[in-house]
Amino acid sequence: QSRRSIHSPVSLRNKSIRIKKESTISQPTILWFRQDLRLADNPALVAACEMGLVIPVYILEDAKNQQWSPGGASRWWLHHALLSLDKSLHGKLNIYQGDPLVILTELAENNNAGAVLWNRCYEPESIERDGLIKSSLKDAGLNVQSFNGSLLWEPWQVLKKDDTPYKVFTPYYRRGCLSKSAPRRPLAQPANMQLHKLEHSLSVDDLSLLPTIGWDKKMHEHWDISEEGAKDRLDEFVFNGIQDYREGRNFPNKKNVSRLSPYLHFGQISVNTAWYAANDAAALIDNESNLDTFLSELGWREFSYYLLYHFPALP
């Protein structure tokens, strides 16, 4: 069988996938980065590193495969987030563009991988895609695992007494989430990462994410698009901004606005890290309502994913 290019739009329909298995000792693990572009508190990364050699992969999906494509500002942020992640991975991030099922299947086959790991996404479109990928790779004999790296509580964990999902935020958050066990503590960055760079990886520039007109220049003055920048932003907010969050958040020019949204969206910091950073600073916060309001805003983020999960026609 001829070896196909990793970028070729090959249809896998009616094709039986067979991945050659050799000694499991030498088999690398493919780690698929998505909206979790960080090393700290990354459950899939931790699990992959425990297995041994890791092939870190990012795949920019073709627009034709997506119902919604990211806008210019999101693409600009993603460009710099990927550069930062690649630097954190010592230049070992493998970048591709196309259909994730085709690309992951070929990567597993060509590199004798034993497992493919990722952190879960919760939008209906992503769930459908990931389910297809997981079943296809499992049928091919691979160990496929997904983890919660995005939410404080899994959507299926928080239900009403009749086992139906909540539709109103306050009972969802107060009666549902807060009555559950506390969210897990953030995981440390793996101390030992054995990373493998492949020959045919694209570069971040190859993805053409940056705008052709330089409207983005002033944005660089206000954002450090990196995992370290996310940590600094969180620290600045917790120590200087959360004190008057309940009222100050209504004024975008004030320091009380957390400015964590893009970091959370692209996963450069985890919601668990934000949750516990705020909780651990409770002694420094004069008015408890400011802490409660910030945590409930993280709860609103949870509720959005929760509704998309339980009501997939919502979009």
Listing of model-derived features with the role each one plays in the protein:
Residues 1, 28, 72-73, 149, ...:
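Acidic, low-complexity intrinsically disordered regions
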Residues 2-9:
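Extreme N-terminal basic, low-complexity initiation segments
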Residues 5, 142, 164-315:
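Glycine/tryptophan-enriched, flexible segments
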Residues 10-11, 274:
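Residue-level recognition of conserved structural "scaffold" positions that shape functional pockets
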Residues 13, 17-183:
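Trp/Phe/Arg-rich N-terminal binding region typifying the photolyase-homology
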